[in-house]
C-alpha cells in the first residue's frame, strides 16, 4: 500500500511539472557503463539527480554518483527508496531481478529491443528464443510493477549508433577502414531507422515527466528511414579516406560468407541476418512522439561516432 501511494503521489507531481527542491530525486541505474547508460548517467547528473549505479567492476565515484559493485544475480540489500530505477542492460535479467527484489521506486524505465518483433518469426531457433525471452521479460516487468503500484515503461531501440560501441554500424566502419572496401549483396535495400545513443538516453529521462507512458512499450527508431545500402554509404562517407562500397550478386556474397564461416569468421552474419538486409525493419515512432515528445535526429554520422 505504501508503495502504491508513493507511486500515485509521484505521478501527480510529475504530471503537474513540480520539481521542488525537497522532492527526492534518487535514481538506481543498471548498465550505466554501457553505451546508452553512460549518456543516461550524464543526463541524470546534469538534471540534479543523485545516482547509484551498479557495476561488476569497481568504478570511481563522482559528484552525485556512487557505484555499487555487483550484478543482477546476487543478493540485494535495498539502499532505497529511489524515485526511479533504470535498466540499460539485458531486459530478461533485469525483469527477473525486479520481480524478486523488494525495491521501493514508483518509476521504472527499462530498455528492451525491437528484436522482440523482428526475430519472433526467424528461421533461426536462437533468434526466436531471443524474441521469446524479450516478450516474456516485458510481460513480467509490467506485471511486477503493477503488483507493487509502480509505473514501468519499456523502450525498444532499433539500430543503435553514436558511441563507437555498437555491434553493427561501428563494426562496418572499422572493417571498411581496415580493408578500404565494404561488400554488400545486391538487393540489400531493406529500410532501416538507425538511432543515436543520445536520443535514447534523452527518451529515458523524458518518459519520467509523462505518466501516460506507464505500462507501455515504445519503439525508438531514428528520425530518418533509409535503405540499408544508403545507410552503409553514409557510414563510409564519414570516414577518411572514404572506403569503397562494392555491390556483388547475392549468390557470390553467400558463397564468400560460407567460406568465412568455415574459417570461423563472421559467425553473427547467418542466413536470417542476410535475409533481413532485404527486409524493411522500420517501426512506428509516432506513439513515442505523441506520448513524451520523442524527437530523434536524422542519420548524419561522423567518424567519431564509430570510435575512429
Question: What residue spans do the PLM features occupy?
Answer:
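Substrate-positioning beta->alpha
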Residues: 166-171, 186-208, 215-219
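N-terminal Rossmann-fold cofactor-binding loop
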Residues: 54-58
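Active-site Tyr-X1-5-Lys
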Residues: 129-153
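Mid/C-terminal beta-alpha module of Rossmann-like enzyme folds, strongest
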Residues: 207-269, 285, 290-308
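Conserved SDR Rossmann-fold cofactor-binding beta-strand/turn motif
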Residues: 156-157, 161
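NAD(P)H-binding glycine-rich loop region in Rossmannoid oxidoreductase-like domains
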Residues: 65-106, 110, 114-125
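Alpha-helical membrane-targeting segments
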Residues: 171-194, 242-281
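N-terminal Rossmann NAD(P)H-binding glycine-rich loop of SDR-like oxidoreductase domains
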Residues: 28-45
Amino acid at each position: 500500500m505504501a508503495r502504491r501511494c508513493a507511486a500515485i503521489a509521484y505521478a501527480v507531481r510529475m504530471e503537474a511539472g513540480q520539481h521542488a527542491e525537497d522532492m527526492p530525486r534518487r535514481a538506481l541505474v543498471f548498465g550505466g557503463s554501457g553505451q546508452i547508460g553512460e549518456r543516461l548517467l550524464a543526463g541524470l547528473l546534469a538534471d540534479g539527480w543523485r545516482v547509484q549505479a551498479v557495476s561488476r567492476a569497481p568504478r570511481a565515484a563522482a559528484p552525485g554518483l556512487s557505484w555499487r559493485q555487483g550484478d543482477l544475480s546476487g543478493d540485494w540489500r535495498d539502499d532505497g527508496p529511489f524515485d526511479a530505477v533504470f535498466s540499460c542492460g539485458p531486459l530478461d535479467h533485469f525483469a527477473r531481478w525486479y520481480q524478486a527484489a523488494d525495491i521501493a521506486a514508483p518509476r521504472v524505465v527499462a530498455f528492451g529491443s525491437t528484436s522482440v518483433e523482428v526475430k519472433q518469426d526467424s528461421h533461426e531457433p536462437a533468434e526466436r528464443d531471443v524474441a521469446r525471452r524479450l516478450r516474456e521479460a516485458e510481460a513480467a516487468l509490467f506485471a511486477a510493477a503493477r503488483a507493487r503500484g509502480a509505473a514501468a515503461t519499456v523502450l525498444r531501440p532499433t539500430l543503435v549508433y553514436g558511441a563507437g560501441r555498437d555491434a553493427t554500424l561501428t563494426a562496418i566502419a572499422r572493417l571498411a577502414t581496415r580493408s578500404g572496401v565494404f561488400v554488400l549483396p545486391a538487393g540489400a535495400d531493406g529500410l532501416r531507422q538507425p538511432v543515436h545513443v543520445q536520443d535514447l538516453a534523452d527518451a529515458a529521462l523524458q518518459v519520467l515527466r509523462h505518466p501516460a507512458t506507464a505500462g507501455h512499450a515504445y519503439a525508438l527508431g531514428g528520425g530518418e528511414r533509409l535503405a540499408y545500402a544508403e545507410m552503409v554509404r553514409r557510414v563510409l562517407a564519414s570516414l577518411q579516406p572514404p572506403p569503397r562500397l562494392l555491390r556483388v550478386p547475392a549468390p557470390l556474397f553467400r558463397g564468400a560468407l560460407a567460406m568465412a564461416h568455415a574459417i570461423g569468421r563472421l559467425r553473427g552474419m547467418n542466413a536470417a541476418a542476410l535475409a533481413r538486409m532485404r527486409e524493411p525493419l522500420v517501426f512506428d515512432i509516432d506513439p513515442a512522439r505523441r506520448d513524451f515528445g520523442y524527437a530523434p535526429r536524422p542519420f548524419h554520422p561522423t567518424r567519431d561516432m564509430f570510435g575512429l
